[in-house]
Amino acid sequence: YMIHIADKVGAGEGLMGVILAVSAFTELPAMALFPRMHRRLSLRTLFRVCAATFVLKDLLFWVARSPVLLYVAAVIQFFEFGIFLPACVYYVAERLDSANQAKGQGLIHVCSNGLGPAVMTAIGGRLIDSAGINTMLMVTTAAGFAGFLVVLAATSRYLDKGDQGK
């Protein structure tokens, strides 16, 4: 839906391409730095940062009236998927025995990169067609906030192995 978001701020295809490129580019350093981040921060904290950033990015897309906020939203992808993807790998490696790690990775990625996005893409498309891009972005922000609350609840008792709540 990035083309609709770019159109909303008066830009077009060129901005859409740049925003997507910046988003993808910022994930790489986050992934490379993840082992160092994880030495300092628990997976609980890292998952919470990711969840908060998902909400912030959706909110920035929703309230954006100029390309500047879209660039900011693209840069914070560092804290979103750039941390989320390696955090999932570490979580599975720490929590499952080696015989079940491939299944664990598969399940996480089917939910986070397959089934969930497929369902939400269909809903988002319907919302854009029936109510417009701003309504879709409002719903996305609300859904992201609900997801953030789920992450907070799910991680409230979680401690990394050997971690005393860092």
Residue ranges of each PLM-predicted region?
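Multi-pass alpha-helical transporter architecture, strongest
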Residues: 141-166
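Helix-to-loop junctions at the C-terminal end of transmembrane segments
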Residues: 29-43, 128-129
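Helix-loop junctions at membrane interfaces in 12-TM secondary transporters
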Residues: 60-73
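Short amphipathic helix-loop junctions that connect adjacent transmembrane helices
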Residues: 1-16
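Intracellular juxtamembrane helix-capping segments at the cytosolic ends
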Residues: 83-97
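Structural signature of the two symmetry-related core transmembrane helices
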Residues: 45-60
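Loop-to-transmembrane helix entry/capping segments in MFS-fold secondary transporters
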Residues: 13-14, 96-109
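A membrane-interface helix-boundary motif in multi-pass transporters
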Residues: 126-146
